[in-house]
Amino acid sequence: MAKEELIQFEGLVTEILPDARYRVQLDAGHEIVAYTAGKMKKNRIKTLAGDRVTIEMSPYDLEKGRLIFRHKDERPSGAPRGGPPRGGQFRRR
């Protein structure tokens, strides 16, 4: 299969599944299971629930896809990815 036959969609990671797979809600409303592309594994790009991603799929199987890109957040660099700030966890007396 040539790469020209693959189609791309954007979506939102809703759940992290075992074996490096993700449940992704596409912008079109469909829900699929996707795995991480080799280049993302090689460069150690972590994907968490709630991340916007680009999925590459074969037109022959629209239930599975390959996660090829994680979109950057609108948060400023250095800001925590999730949860409340933990600044006061260890205080001096």
From Swiss-Prot:
Which N-terminal stretch is annotated as signal sequence?
A: none
Record bears the keyword Ubl conjugation:
no
SUPFAM superfamilies for this protein: Nucleic acid-binding proteins
Pfam families from the UniProt entry: eIF-1a
Q: Where in the cell is it found?
A: Cytoplasm
List each copy of the S1-like domain by range. Answer: 1-72
Q: What is this protein called?
A: Translation initiation factor IF-1
Question: Where is it chiefly localized?
Answer: cytoplasm
Indicate the quaternary assembly.
Component of the 30S ribosomal translation pre-initiation complex which assembles on the 30S ribosome in the order IF-2 and IF-3, IF-1 and N-formylmethionyl-tRNA(fMet); mRNA recruitment can occur at any time during PIC assembly.
Enumerate the NCBIfam families for this protein: infA
Family from the record: Belongs to the IF-1 family.
Q: Where is this region: Disordered?
A: 69-93
Decide whether keyword rRNA-binding is in the record.
yes
The function of this protein is:
One of the essential components for the initiation of protein synthesis. Stabilizes the binding of IF-2 and IF-3 on the 30S subunit to which N-formylmethionyl-tRNA(fMet) subsequently binds. Helps modulate mRNA selection, yielding the 30S pre-initiation complex (PIC). Upon addition of the 50S ribosomal subunit IF-1, IF-2 and IF-3 are released leaving the mature 70S translation initiation complex.
